Amino acid sequence: LLLTPSMAQVVVNDPVATSQAVITCGNARFTVLTPEMIRVEYSEQAKFEDRATFTIVNRKLDAPQFTKSEDDTYLYITTSNLKLKYRKGTDPRTLPASPSNLTITISGNGVSSVWYPGKPDPLNLKGTSRTLDGLMGESKRAEMENGLVSRSGWAVIDDSWASPRSDGGRSYALSPNSDMGYPWWTQRADNHAMDTYVLGYGHNYKKALADYTKIAGNIPLPPNYIFGYWYSKYSSYSADDYRNIMSDLKTNKIPTDVMVIDMDWHWNGNAYSQSEGRGGWTGWSWNTNLIPNPKGLLSEMHSQNFKTALNLHPADGINQIESPTYFAAMNSELGGKYLNDSRNNINWSLDYTDFTKSFFKNIIRDHESEGVDFWWLDWQQYLTSPYTNSLSETFWCNYVFFNEAAKRTGHRPVIFHRWGGLGSHRYQIGFSGDANISYEALAFEPYFTATASNVGYGYWGHDLGGHMFSNEELVNNPNLVLRWIQFGVFTPIFRTHATN
């Protein structure tokens, strides 16, 4: 399926549904969004969510034609494709799952089927998952989340806070925040409420995905250079190494659009980086032993028409030894609020607006002024925040970095990142992680790339050539490398990569 991105950079979303589309029945509320899509809510406190969430950002659609009727026992809502039957006064969810309190009958587009809360869907065509870290053949298939299309003719978006995502995160609400310039996470109206979207599109998969983007947000159009070739390798390259690489690419007439600088750009405690043990996976200051004039090198890259990206592992915060200047500026600005004396650092605290503003002002904007075009968010650490219950670090990093990128003038916003769950299509290109170097891993990636379109995630970028390895004979196997490159030609993001 071809997913067409939106060219518009500013899209006005409104999470409050058209009043004519909303039917309230006691502690239950139903919103008819399209003839094939109904939102089902149930709250014992009758507290319903009208704000955006991590998954859903727009409910202001024209109310479709439908009829509503009821008797002493049931409420009925009927559209051209769906018929909802709700036993009044009951929680639609039952244990075990059963059709006793709520059913939605789907008809049309080649399907006649009945859905009820908790009904399994063995025919779902799958979506994607957070990462291919450690991929060995089919090992990641079981981790793939359900997609929005199914041969059953229906699919479900469970946006309830009580239903954890695959990484343990939850779908928080988003509330306008004038201080940040974009909405910020906040608690849901009722953390125990049911909040489910039922998509009954039959076999009209294209319309299902199109209508999903109407409520979950458009897929932003990536910058043109994203679709060129990316040079990337995990190796402690010096500035002269990069100059030689750029020269070789030109000499061999390999058109290249992006030069990725992996984690050795900063002090990282690696002997190869001559960093005297400073830093680790996380770092913010240039390793001047390798790259003595960072701004000059990035300027050279730009002069040869290379866009630049830097790798980030943010989880360990800002260390006083690795980044003394950034540490001092942020610690002074924040009044020592997030200081961890035992580790000599400022804790990573993107949950909070004051930390986020200081971090972007002092560190990220500084590097962007040097010439960094976009960021590779290589989050591999704890999956949920240690400070905010079930806040997904992957999704929240993606959300914040993309919204901050949108503030830059003259740049179409883009980040390179792992999938953070439904809603991540709004941050349009993905990094699939550290796959194993093997024929089995390569064989799985075309399937994995294609199914991601079933959640609107159309632009996976893989480590072409693989990264991790257990079989040394395959690491530089020319046939395997060639076949991976052939696959890369038809992959949305053409980025070769390798271990050091």
Describe the predicted segments one by one.
Residues 115, 255-500:
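Aromatic- and carboxylate-enriched substrate-binding clefts and catalytic-loop regions
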Residues 69-223, 233-234, 239, 246-251:
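Catalytic and substrate-binding clefts that recognize carbohydrates or anionic sugar/phosphate headgroups
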Residues 219-232, 336-347:
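N-terminal small/glycine-rich loop or linker at the start of catalytic domains
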Residues 33-72:
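A low-complexity, Ser/Thr/Gly/Pro-enriched, surface-exposed linker/loop concept
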